[in-house]
Amino acid sequence: MIRRACQSVKKLPKRPCFWYNKGNGGVFMENWRKDARHEPIIVDLEALVPKEHLLRKIEKVMDYEWLYERLDPYYCHDNGRPGTDPVVLIKMVLIQHLFGIPSLRQTYREIQVNVAYRWFLGYGLLDNIPHFATVSYAFCKRFPDELTSEIFEHILNKALNNRMLDTSAIFIDGTHIKASANKKKFQKEQVAKAARVYSGQLRREVNEEREKLGKKPIEDDDGENQGSGGSQETAEKTVSTTDPDCGMFVKGEHERQFAYEAHTACDKHGFVLGVEVTSGNVSDSVAWDAVYDKVTDRFPEVKFVTMDAGYKTPWIAKKVIEDSRIPILPYTRYKGKKDTFKPWDFTYNVVNDSFVCPGGHELRHTTTSKDGKRTYRSATQVCKDCPCRSVCGANENGQRMLTTHIWQEFLDLVEQLRKTERGKEIYAMRKQTIERVFADAKEKHAMRYTHHRGLARVSAWVRLKYAAMNLKKLALWKWSRSDFFVFLPYFFFDCLLYTSPSPRDRQKS
């Protein structure tokens, strides 16, 4: 039956071949070989750039008059060959950072063939683009060193004036940037340990406690009295022979590389408020003071300071709380032995400044180290016959020791704040604020590694990255606001149209 049905169906004619025509001697159809590469046309460059292009939105919010006034003293207007417009050079660098182009050389090549880039610079299709060496020389030799910081601050002020910042809570964290240095080319050096910001205050409080305990005061050994024979602590450091300013960054258990660290602060909306660049081997808690002081001096209305576990130190908790702000820090796991009494199992006696163990024995305050750590010890005779000795965690001498910091009460207060609903809510915003800033900077703006060498050049490079990110967010937000206000009259008209009574309803009433 199927065979009969197939035989009854007429054979359809063959489809004509559009690629090969036997009648014309096997020549391709001319309509498919149209070539307009050499066709002369008259076109307006303005019409070639899409209306929704990012550079159009940036051009609408950015002003450059202050740049001309700022850079006017660095140009000669009555002698020599005319120089390149400085705003054009700055725009070329902004293009590089806005679109994540790795180098100025590649940026120069992209601008030559990109119509939108030429429009943004104000150049025509046949105009010669400034060479990338001209841009590099201007930023290295001609322009002032603080220009990148001024560009960053100017864009941040624009966001502030447009009420786009929410600095009620700030988020501080650090991310590493791979340096342009071979990790196999290094040398070991003995370098002096940098003095902490709080070392003087800590030493005074420690010496006060040591005097009460009948101990000798700790002398100043941070290098302030080297002229009088004082000693300064040193440490061995791995120094790159290619870029001595970078530091060895331990990335995981097996990976080590030379890198820089960008310690960054942002607000609730992801706008970068401040950045401090250090070598990769500098701890987050060491560089925290510079970032925190800079941001809070400019935005004193900050109420919450959110950080990760790397910033959970007594000094940071103390400074934030004494500034009448609330530190939001995460839970950190206990690093002691699992089968012994934990520090929170001991009860503190405020009157005697001592601890009472779960077995009912007293641990007295014996000394305070120069690091600010108080040591509490139990009596050997008491612990000798204690039934809890197997789980007590006593040392070889039969003494149970407990160590707390001189500013431990601030860390205890941080733990209480962490458990509040407000604290949990704000800490959960880290993934959409500071972590999002780092993700966008590395994935969209090529901040995963740098070709620059030297701390000053890398710092300027990072500030331009963050300035471009703030400018992009500012332009997109302002563009969306303008669209909203354009649509707003039509919205109210529709509301009046549907809510107003019809003529028939008026007659009935």
Regions found by a protein language model. Give the residues of each.
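Short, Lys/Arg-enriched N-terminal segments with co-localized hydrophobic residues
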Residues: 10-28
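Basic, short loop/linker segments at the boundary and entry of helix-turn-helix/winged-helix-like folds
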Residues: 51, 56-94, 99-100
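Polybasic low-complexity intrinsically disordered regions
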Residues: 112, 122, 130-322, 328-332, ...
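Basic, amphipathic alpha-helical segments enriched in Lys/Arg and hydrophobic/aromatic residues
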Residues: 282, 380-385, 424-496
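Phosphate/diphosphate-binding loops
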Residues: 319, 326-361
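Cysteine-cluster motifs in flexible loop/terminal segments that predominantly coordinate metals
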Residues: 356, 360-366, 372-402
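Conserved small/polar residues in nucleotide/adenosyl-binding loops
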Residues: 498-503
